[in-house]
Amino acid sequence: MNSRHPSAPYRGRFAPSPTGPLHLGSLYTAVVGFCEARRRGGAWLVRIDDADRQRCRQTHADSILRTLETHGLWWDEAVLFQSLRDEIYRVALERLAAGSRVFPCTCPRRELAGSGPIYSGRCRARYPHPPAGEHALRLRVGDAVIGFDDRLQGRIEQDLGSAVGDFVVRRRDGLPAYHLATVIDDAEQRVTEVLRGVDLLDSTPRQILLQECLGLPRPDYCHIPVLTDRGGIKLSKQAGARPVDEDAPSENLWTVLALLGFVPEPPLIGAKPAEILDWAVAHWDIRRLPPGRRIDVGGLAV
């Protein structure tokens, strides 16, 4: 399905997973999305991607929302929590099953890890009926070749069969996979542009295929450079990124804006977060983002 009509009001979203407190890399993504939405006179939404019950914690979700508030990054509508939407995802899976788009997979994790990143198709025709035990569900990819135009990264095309193969849409434990939950929630929230880190660029063709299978609208996409340390490693919780200091929101915002090439005007030094964000929105142009796929934070304590 084509993208939304260009006259539709802009709707962006920030969708962190509550596996830990907000760090500088996540704050940077939130600031870029917030400024883009405000500059375009649109809405900025927040969604908590907590479908993974094993890794996500409500305390972290509360912390993330509090940090956004402290930094003046106020959202426009009620926060959506994936953990409350299991029934919606189940119905979508039933639709895929009714169209023979998914199949059960019982491949052990160890076997999958040893066979490389591309699924072999071992279970594709193995089960005429769903097995009784635990099993994942995979989407049949076939010969799908997906192309899209990313606002910053240009034309992207991917042959899903040779790049990833049939991919998981429901995990063995019954929880929805990231790609399924993401496309359903983006559609329900009427997101017109998915703005996120370039590390998720390769996920987009899978999500577009799911949108086509479920008859969902395709939003526009804008994948921004990620923040990395001096070793070129993306700032992340897994890599030990520190939580942002909630006692220094103005300083944190200026750090993010400086990494983006924005230099504060003297009267704004020491300003409150709301004033800083108003200034940033007034001067905002996403084309000013540094070129490439990463921004080195240098010697910052992150």
Curated annotation (Swiss-Prot):
Motif 'HIGH' region location, chain numbering: 16-26
Binding site for L-glutamate: R13, F14, A15, P16, S17, D49, Y178, R196
Transmembrane segments: none
Biological-process GO terms, alphabetical: glutamyl-tRNA aminoacylation; tRNA modification
Molecular function (Gene Ontology), one example: glutamate-tRNA ligase activity
Binding-site positions, ATP: K237
A Pfam family: tRNA-synt_1c
Residue sites binding Zn(2+) per the record: C105, C107, Y119, C123
Protein's name according to its UniProt entry: Glutamyl-Q tRNA(Asp) synthetase
